[in-house]
């Protein structure tokens, strides 16, 4: 089984086993409820078996390169958003920022990555405004890339992005992926996650 197909199968099976719909922008943030499954006390949806996280090599909106492979030793949270999202993306970013604040000294053990699904409108200026409005400035890296880089990333992470020319909004999978310090996909959080779940799980992800 290919790496991309394997990741897709793991994520889909985990979501279906908990009867969770992977919500997209324009859908209700309460479309599903995260239930802890068997595992080391994690409160998201635990992925079994745990697979190495797909590659991710982009740059933040200031131009600095960011590689997932360089973040070994930290827990990493990855989500896919866009600044013009009318509903779920602002909530995801706000809740991730709240979790990062709530972690206190443990915040040094996690890196939060938000990958654009709308590179045309996600300009550095738009990103700065978006993050500032949600208390997320300096609390996560908002990642951009060339069209080819982003297409590769979306495919590797099995992110469905509506790139049609007549789209009104960018429909996409609205979840957060939790990655261990060893670089393995351990857990997925549906869009109705709480900051408390992230605060609980980060120390566990950071030591595995």
Please place each PLM-identified region on the residue numbering.
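N-terminal "domain-start" segment that seeds a small globular fold
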Residues: 33-69, 94
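Hydrophobic beta-strand anchors of alpha/beta hydrolase catalytic cores
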Residues: 77-78, 112, 176
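Thiol/disulfide oxidoreductase modules built on the thioredoxin-like
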Residues: 147-201
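Short active-site neighborhood of thiol/selenol oxidoreductases, capturing the structured segment around
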Residues: 68-96
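Bacterial signal peptide processing site
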Residues: 26-29
